[in-house]
């Protein structure tokens, strides 16, 4: 028992949120189980359509039987919920009438027990989690087919399992895995992840529903899968220098599926920009560094520290190159299965891989007095060098560095752009300085090579002004 008013108030807030969510979704009714069953059946249909005609009947039927086991287990949950849903209603009634026995777990958690259901509510760094734990729904053992062995030659399979498959497992385990009774396991709310995880671990696996998540926006099932294999967590990172290029890319692929974000954003000029990000905890980042530095030569990345997390981000052409390279190491049947599962992260990786590499972030920049400036060919028929500063202090630092290098008469323009301050060097200023002009010419030549539209004529005109010989050569190329 506790009489501390603050502790009681916090517990009351958690229970109020849980009660509101359960009432909102009528979680005691089995409608949400039926939606999950429908999702599994849709997944089954998509797999059959995608794979039929490409692979043998035995392979396809084995995959469909795997999905059928999840459907059967969902049906068992549906029957179970018809019998135990009343426990949820009673739990809510007891909470509202003050009859419930509430267990306070520290400052950020409470629990309420019924005969077959336990309500578990926790305050996290990102919000409140509300779970209904099932006390007596048994798990099931499923047999997972080795679809890779059946779709590869013996030589291909041997190479795949010793290199790529091990790395694919390692990436998933590093981001989403944990050890359960000495074996590797994971919890997921996603149907696609349950299928992919299972297929990467052929043999026998144990599946059980560990909890029902009553979220603010929906009700989901937490699936727990435990394989018969020892965990690789931490082991792949320890041998990053020994991974093949294919293994390195396979590891990154599943790590990004686990803890990554893949999207097409808009850059500062409104153009599509590919972005691939993976979040790594502060305490784990040191272990990741050897692997990340192996990627550096081909796929440059940026590190952005966050709240106990480091975000490693690949932009533009480097993100496109990484997406293409990761897809290239996947076996055909895995790509077909991912296509059938059709989940957002995979679709975005494919979309990025199909984008045209117009530039790689930093490729259209030059360094002036120790600061990076983007070479911007503007619509008003001029070229400007722009540096985005986060605040006035950085602006003052840029101006001081420029004038220390080129003299007090070095003029710049300052303007606001969203949350940034832009330091702009006009063309009539930078063309007076040969070292700056030479770097601008190199970037304009790169732009010219990668530009197909009317802007080629504009770039050629500027090259003629800055470097008459190169400009003339570019003009001849444009005409032909």
Task: Name the predicted role of every residue range.
Residues 1-480:
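Internal intein/HINT superfamily modules and their associated LAGLIDADG
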């Amino acid at each position: 028992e506790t009489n501390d008013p603050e502790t009681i108030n916090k517990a009351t807030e958690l229970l109020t949120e849980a009660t509101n969510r359960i009432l909102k979704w009528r979680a005691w009714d089995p409608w949400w189980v039926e939606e999950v069953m429908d999702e599994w059946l849709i997944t089954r249909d998509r797999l059959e359509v995608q794979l039929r005609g490409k692979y043998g009947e035995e392979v396809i039927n084995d995959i469909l039987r795997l999905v059928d086991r999840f459907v059967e287990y969902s049906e068992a949950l549906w029957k179970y919920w018809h019998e135990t849903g009343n426990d949820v209603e009673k739990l809510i009634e007891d909470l509202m009438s003050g009859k419930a026995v509430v267990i306070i777990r520290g400052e950020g958690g409470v629990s309420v027990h019924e005969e077959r259901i336990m309500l578990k509510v926790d305050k996290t760094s990102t919000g409140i989690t509300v779970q209904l734990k099932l006390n007596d729904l048994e798990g099931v053992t499923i047999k997972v087919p080795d679809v890779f062995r059946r779709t590869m030659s013996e030589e291909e399979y041997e190479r795949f399992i010793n290199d790529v498959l091990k790395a694919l497992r390692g990436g998933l385990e590093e981001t989403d895995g944990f050890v359960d009774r000495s074996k590797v396991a994971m919890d997921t709310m996603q149907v696609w992840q349950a299928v992919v995880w299972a297929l990467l671990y052929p043999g026998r696996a144990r599946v059980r529903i560990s909890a029902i998540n009553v979220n603010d926006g929906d009700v989901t099932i937490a699936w727990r899968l435990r394989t018969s294999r020892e965990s690789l967590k931490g082991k792949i990172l320890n041998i990053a220098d020994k991974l093949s290029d294919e293994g390195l890319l396979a590891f990154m692929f599943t790590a990004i599926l686990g803890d990554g974000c893949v999207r097409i954003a808009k850059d500062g000029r409104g153009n599509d920009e590919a972005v691939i990000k993976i979040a790594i905890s502060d305490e784990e980042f040191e272990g990741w560094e050897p692997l990340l530095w192996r990627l550096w030569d081909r796929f440059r990345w940026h590190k952005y520290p966050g709240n106990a997390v480091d975000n490693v981000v690949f932009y533009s052409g480097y993100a496109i190159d990484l997406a293409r390279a990761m897809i290239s190491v996947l076996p055909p049947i895995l790509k077909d299965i991912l296509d059938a599962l059709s989940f957002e992260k995979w679709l975005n990786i494919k979309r990025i891989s199909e984008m045209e590499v117009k530039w790689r972030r930093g490729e259209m920049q030059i360094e002036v007095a120790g600061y990076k400036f983007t070479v911007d060919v503007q619509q008003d028929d001029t070229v400007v060098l722009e540096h985005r500063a986060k605040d006035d202090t950085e602006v003052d630092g840029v101006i001081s560095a420029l004038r220390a290098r080129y003299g007090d008469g070095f003029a710049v323009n300052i303007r606001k752009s969203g949350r940034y301050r832009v330091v702009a060097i006009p063309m009539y200023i930078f063309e007076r300085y040969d070292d700056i002009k030479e770097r601008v010419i190199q970037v304009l030549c790169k732009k010219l090579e990668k530009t197909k539209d009317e802007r080629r004529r504009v770039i050629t005109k500027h090259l003629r002004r800055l470097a008459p010989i190169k400009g003339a050569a570019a003009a001849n190329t444009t005409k032909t």
